């Protein structure tokens, strides 16, 4: 159902990066002991999650997530409500791999329909080559299966658009802001051209801009009423350790422990694609040369056959 205004911001797309996947660890007496009460046949502990890039908050656009696990697991359909600054996640134990269904429910202001993601739980080392599998084995047995994704909001409704562009906040300020949906007291409202991750149909600026904001300091009594009026205390936006601002489409510049997705990762993937293209071009060249030799040989045989009595 559309918001009261019922109007969409035409010609605008806003995207927000996030990460989803699973992390699994085999039970081990020293590094990962099995908790009491866990069935004997369970060999691993694992976590399935959806979170923001560089662990920034995403509850301003994602309200809740429904995780559908294997039917053999008790309470296999679970709803996780968003908690500001924390990932949507479930911790479990088991012995087998299976496909997990994740249904994303957006904040009411978006009026967007739920979307579904699918992810295969990985308990054992995997990869395209034996070297990749061996690298996982050397990682203390921890098996990481994460996916980088971008949520695109096409022509969002005006109330939701205002939330999305309500200003990027440094991660340290997330606990200072009230509520998980709006921009907070004193938040600036830049245009889409100045908002990371906002673009028009003609193309937009995806770079972040530092802006001065203010936060309200309010004390309350037991009844929840204000004991004094809001006091504005200005602060300057700063980048997080990974170079990411909250409520933005930024991603880290370099990789860090526990944060494998960055511009550095992107460049490495681009380099792999370039190397693969060179290899394919070389294979294509060799194939064409072999084909040309075979064609000449075929023409020679046809000529000999024509001369034969």
From Swiss-Prot:
<keyword id="KW-0963">Cytoplasm</keyword>
<dbReference type="GO" id="GO:0000812">
    <property type="term" value="C:Swr1 complex"/>
</dbReference>
<dbReference type="GO" id="GO:0005737">
    <property type="term" value="C:cytoplasm"/>
</dbReference>
<dbReference type="GO" id="GO:0035267">
    <property type="term" value="C:NuA4 histone acetyltransferase complex"/>
</dbReference>
<keyword id="KW-0010">Activator</keyword>
<keyword id="KW-0539">Nucleus</keyword>
<keyword id="KW-0175">Coiled coil</keyword>
<comment type="function">
    <text>Component of the SWR1 complex which mediates the ATP-dependent exchange of histone H2A for the H2A variant H2A.Z leading to transcriptional regulation of selected genes by chromatin remodeling. Component of the NuA4 histone acetyltransferase complex which is involved in transcriptional activation of selected genes principally by acetylation of nucleosomal histones H4 and H2A. The NuA4 complex is also involved in DNA repair. Yaf9 may also be required for viability in conditions in which the structural integrity of the spindle is compromised.</text>
</comment>
<feature type="compositionally biased region" description="Low complexity">
    <location>
        <begin position="187"/>
        <end position="203"/>
    </location>
</feature>
<dbReference type="InterPro" id="IPR055129">
    <property type="entry name" value="YEATS_dom"/>
</dbReference>
<protein>
    <recommendedName>
        <fullName>Protein AF-9 homolog</fullName>
    </recommendedName>
</protein>
<dbReference type="Pfam" id="PF03366">
    <property type="entry name" value="YEATS"/>
</dbReference>
<dbReference type="InterPro" id="IPR005033">
    <property type="entry name" value="YEATS"/>
</dbReference>
<comment type="subunit">
    <text>Component of the SWR1 chromatin-remodeling complex and of the NuA4 histone acetyltransferase complex.</text>
</comment>
<dbReference type="GO" id="GO:0006281">
    <property type="term" value="P:DNA repair"/>
</dbReference>
<keyword id="KW-0234">DNA repair</keyword>
<keyword id="KW-0805">Transcription regulation</keyword>
<feature type="coiled-coil region">
    <location>
        <begin position="265"/>
        <end position="309"/>
    </location>
</feature>
<feature type="region of interest" description="Disordered">
    <location>
        <begin position="175"/>
        <end position="241"/>
    </location>
</feature>
<keyword id="KW-0227">DNA damage</keyword>
<comment type="similarity">
    <text>Belongs to the YAF9 family.</text>
</comment>
<keyword id="KW-0156">Chromatin regulator</keyword>
<dbReference type="GO" id="GO:0005634">
    <property type="term" value="C:nucleus"/>
</dbReference>
<feature type="compositionally biased region" description="Basic and acidic residues">
    <location>
        <begin position="222"/>
        <end position="234"/>
    </location>
</feature>
<keyword id="KW-0804">Transcription</keyword>
<feature type="domain" description="YEATS">
    <location>
        <begin position="8"/>
        <end position="167"/>
    </location>
</feature>
<dbReference type="GO" id="GO:0042393">
    <property type="term" value="F:histone binding"/>
</dbReference>
<dbReference type="InterPro" id="IPR038704">
    <property type="entry name" value="YEAST_sf"/>
</dbReference>
<dbReference type="GO" id="GO:0006357">
    <property type="term" value="P:regulation of transcription by RNA polymerase II"/>
</dbReference>
<feature type="compositionally biased region" description="Basic residues">
    <location>
        <begin position="204"/>
        <end position="214"/>
    </location>
</feature>
<dbReference type="GO" id="GO:0006338">
    <property type="term" value="P:chromatin remodeling"/>
</dbReference>
């Amino acid at each position: 159902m559309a918001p009261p205004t019922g109007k969409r911001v035409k010609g605008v797309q806003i995207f927000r990066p996030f990460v989803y996947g699973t992390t699994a660890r085999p039970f081990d007496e020293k590094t990962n002991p099995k908790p009491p009460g866990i069935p004997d046949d369970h060999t691993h502990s694992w976590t399935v999650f959806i979170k923001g890039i560089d662990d920034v908050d995403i509850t301003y656009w994602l309200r809740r997530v429904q995780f559908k696990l294997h039917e053999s697991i008790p309470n296999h359909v679970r709803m996780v409500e968003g908690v500001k600054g924390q990932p949507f996640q479930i911790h479990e134990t088991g012995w087998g791999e299976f496909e997990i269904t994740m249904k994303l429910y957006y904040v009411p202001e978006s009026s967007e329909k739920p979307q579904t993601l699918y992810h295969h739980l990985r308990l054992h080392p995997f990869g395209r080559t034996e070297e990749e599998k061996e690298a996982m084995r050397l990682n203390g047995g921890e098996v990481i299966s994460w996916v980088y994704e971008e949520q695109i909001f096409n022509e969002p409704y005006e109330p939701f658009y205002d939330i999305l562009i309500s200003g990027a906040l440094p991660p340290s300020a997330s606990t200072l802001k009230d509520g998980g949906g709006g921009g907070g007291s004193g938040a600036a409202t830049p245009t889409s051209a100045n908002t990371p991750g906002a673009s028009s149909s003609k193309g937009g600026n995806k770079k972040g801009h530092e802006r001065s904001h203010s936060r309200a300091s309010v004390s309350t009594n037991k009844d929840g009423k204000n004991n004094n009026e809001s006091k504005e205390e200005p602060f300057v936006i700063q980048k997080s350790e990974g170079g990411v601002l909250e409520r933005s489409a930024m991603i880290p510049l370099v990789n860090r422990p526990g944060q494998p997705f960055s511009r550095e990762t992107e460049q490495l993937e681009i380099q792999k694609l370039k190397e693969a293209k060179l290899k394919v071009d070389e294979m294509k060249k060799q194939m064409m040369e072999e084909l040309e030799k075979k064609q000449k040989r075929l023409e020679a045989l046809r000529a000999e056959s024509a001369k034969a009595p």
